[in-house]
Amino acid sequence: MQYVVSTIWKHPADMDKDRMREVQAQWRENGNLVNIYWFEIDSTTHGSVSIFKSRDAFEANLALQKEHRKKSTDEYRITMTHEAQGECFAVLQG
C-alpha cells in the first residue's frame, strides 16, 4: 500500500521556483518514492505531496528526508507549518 505525506511550507520571501525544481530533481533516482508534487498556495507558501511505495519505503527514506528538511530550514529559512501522513486506501485513476 502506498504511503502519502502532505506538508505545507512557508518561505521568507517569494519562492524561487527554478531553484526548487532543481532541488526536487535530486530526488528523481530515489527508489522509495513514486512521485513528489509541489504546488503554489501563494507566493511565499507551497504545498507538497510525496507518495512513497509503502510505509516501509517511507521509513527507509526518513533519515534522508530529515536531513533535507533541516537544510531547507537552516539554509533557506523555509519552515514547515503542517504535516499529515498515512497509508493510501483508495486511488482514483483516470
Predicted segments, located by residue:
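Short S/T/G/P-rich N-terminal loop/turn motif that feeds into the first structured element of a domain
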Residues: 1-47, 53-67, 74-94
